Amino acid sequence: MNSKHGNLSINSDNIFPIIKKWLYSDHDIFYRELISNGCDAITKLKKLDLMGEYELADGYEPKIQILVNPEAKTLKFIDNGLGMTADEVEEYINQIAFSGASDFLEKYKDKASEEQIIGHFGLGFYSAFMVADEVHIDSLSYQKDAVPVHWTCDGGTEFDMSDGSKTDVGTEITLFLNEDCLEFANEYRAKEVIQKYCSFMPTPIFLAKENAPEEYETIPAEEVTEKDKVIENIVEEAKFEEKENEDGTKEQVEVSPRMEKAKIVKRPVALNDTHPLWAKHPNDCTDEEYKTFYRKVFQDYKEPLFWIHLNMDYPFNLKGILYFPKINTEYDSIEGTIKLYNNQVFIADNIKEVIPEFLMLLKGVIDCPDLPLNVSRSALQNDGFVQKISDYITKKVADKLSGMCKTDKESYEKYWDDISPFIKFGCLKDEKFCDKMNDYILFKNLDDKYLTLPECLKTEEGTADSKDMDSENADNASENTDEASKDTENTSEADTDTEEEKDSRKPVYYVTDRQQQGQYIKMFQEQDMDAVILDHNIDASFITQLERRNENIKFVRIDADLTDSMKEDVSEEDLKEAKDTLTETFRKALSNENLNVNVEKLKNVEISSVITLSEEGRRMQDMMKMYGMAGMDSSMFGGDQTLILNANNELVKYILENKDSEHVPVFCEQLYDLALLSNHPLSPDAMGKFVARSNKIMLLLAK
């Protein structure tokens, strides 16, 4: 072939300045593009061999070599694929590849940020000009009597092509790096980028420094293969040591046997795993392989709890592994890693348009060859095929979790504390996932047993039934009352029914802090009542959703009110005088005219005072804090606390009977702070006053 000088395209402007400036933060993708081209060339050559159109040489080993040369400022990508003839270079490099790159840039030039384009596939060979001022191609086709070809381009629209000197089938691409991109000729930087994009490509990839001196290693002679280049055969004679026996005699004992070794040129080690674990059938994978793969990919040396192996061929091809790490920290600060691949080529991390958002708390890899590339994120969001992929992944995760709950409840309970934030977050974010997991949400009760929501409700019903049975022997001797009394009773019953109709939902009591709410827990347990532990910050949103989806239930924190079972059966009228007196006394002592005070006769006489806050009021306070409204008056939303005083307690009786005593204000303040302490931590200022007051009271006792 005579030398040829030509234009890449007569119908296009010079695209190279655009390529050089485009995707500045992602210049390293040229590694992926050029290595992918080499993999494709090797795959095609192997297919030709299978079809009988070409016969591979004995001992043929597909490989891609990358040679870095920081001194010469060059990078070489060498494959032993099918190679190209001059006509093919003309067609594929000068026309098709250039046209494809031009179309790609034209289509996405206004969407060049990483937030817009998925993976940045499409520049292909011409991605080399993102980092190079000049590129050479040397190629020899597999075709019989093919002539090697040499092609050069210096970053303009013109090229030169001539006969080359390559002697083995395949293609070698040489990049002459520009001054801004010399980092890519650094061996460590090159390794980093290759492992980022190409860790699982199907062809072995080898990296070396060009013209570097040979390195050697010594191996046992029996391990030498015909591929090894032996530099020297080494014989290490057996070694003996003198040993003294019990009878005092001495003898020579062999401590290391005679060994034959070979000094060989160090064997190259591929940077990638050509058979990733996700590509295997789940039945062929061991637990240790799953754990090893997890540690390797995610650099996390804490073992995952368990994993899901995705393996689907129809109606789309999708494989992958999702790992469940421990997720018992604040869910809104957790960031997992889901790596998305296309035919074992890395695309990007955490593509939420493909992978359901709640799965971002997990770690895993998903390989989907059918995933559309060269599309914007907005296009993926509206792609029905992509939605099917997302739905499938959600279904498999839900199936795994529900299946574990049904067939291995013990393991499911063991993992629950770690995985519950993920499951609850998934329920909040994905209705379909929530539908599938609704019956497999667990709640840990005060005895550390795990219950489903129906089991929680059954427990509450059992407690209520027990209390009802105890009250069946109440006095019913009212048959001879007059009609007026009957009318009064009927009216009272009607009022009660109306009140029940207002909120007939079944309560599920819960605790957010076992230590802080210990007094309330004790009161519950004394009455054989139960509550569930909801101590994660996702629980507030989660129980709101549960109430929306299950209109017959309501979640009530254990300190929202005192249940009837904790109190003696006393009418309000009997306690009215005590309530009025104590309200006036406490408001005066605490200098708080808005203080809500109530008086009850609690069965536990040791309890002097407790604080209650309605569930609605507390949730409103939580919402105010969440939205930075903490300075607003919570009473605007029914959020005032109520101080409950126990009329059966000796100290409360003392205050009631000695309201004018000089010590009563101190006792009132102390009782109020004690009630607050059992509900929530005191402020630093309030705690200081509480400690000083405690010392004062002890001093009074000492006198």
Q: What positions do the PLM features span?
A:
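GHKL (Bergerat-fold) ATPase N-terminal catalytic module, capturing the glycine-rich phosphate-binding loop
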Residues: 1-185, 192, 199, 215-219, ...
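GHKL/Bergerat-fold ATPase module in large chromosome/replication-associated machines
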Residues: 117, 135-158, 178-181, 188-703
